[in-house]
């Protein structure tokens, strides 16, 4: 009963904080098989996510030491800030939809200034990013990659190695980033903060 209630709370929180989400699986692990408000590990698999106007194809989340204080009798419910390990997949379509959203207009403008071209979309192949110009042509002579360090991701011109920081957050640790044939996979770690 408590496990079902915890699962329902997690599902509802995900549906509240995401503009869109298809939840494939939620697994709650408690070492002593009892629920006392603490979840040792929470695993979430989801797809077709839109979070903060960012489109994500697939996501695997592992949350450790989650404390749920469920309130009854009109007392306030809250969740203490747990640590999350997140693996996400971004397809070409995800990135194009994200960059076409008004929320990310300044990022797109920065990229256009960096690559000296207006673009309508991107392509991912050969472990690189290619920009499709507004007139529909791709400059196959110039490709870009993504590089990461502890808290940031940069777009890098493969010819002259110039960089543009496209993500920087001291609260998020970038663990891994790699290109597959048609998508990008990113692994991050962060404390989850609920406001």
Q: Regions from the language model: what does each represent?
A:
Residues 88-182, 189-194:
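Mature, soluble, non-transmembrane domains
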């Amino acid at each position: 009963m408590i496990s079902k209630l915890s699962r329902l709370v997690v599902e509802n929180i995900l549906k509240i904080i995401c503009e869109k989400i298809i939840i494939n699986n939620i697994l709650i692990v408690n070492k002593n098989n009892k629920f006392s408000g603490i979840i040792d590990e929470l695993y979430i698999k989801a797809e077709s996510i839109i979070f903060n106007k960012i489109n994500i194809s697939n996501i695997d989340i592992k949350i450790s030491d989650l404390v749920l204080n469920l309130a009854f009798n009109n007392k306030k419910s809250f969740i203490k800030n747990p640590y999350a390990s997140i693996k996400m997949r971004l397809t070409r379509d995800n990135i194009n939809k994200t960059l076409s959203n008004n929320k990310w207009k300044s990022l797109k403008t920065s990229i256009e200034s960096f690559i000296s071209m207006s673009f309508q979309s991107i392509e991912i192949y050969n472990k690189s990013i290619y920009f499709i110009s507004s007139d529909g042509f791709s400059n196959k002579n110039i490709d870009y990659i993504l590089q990461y360090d502890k808290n940031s991701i940069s777009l890098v011109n493969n010819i002259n190695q110039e960089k543009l920081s496209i993500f920087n957050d001291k609260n998020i640790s970038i663990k891994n980033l790699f290109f597959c044939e048609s998508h990008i996979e990113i692994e991050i770690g962060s404390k989850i903060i609920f406001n």
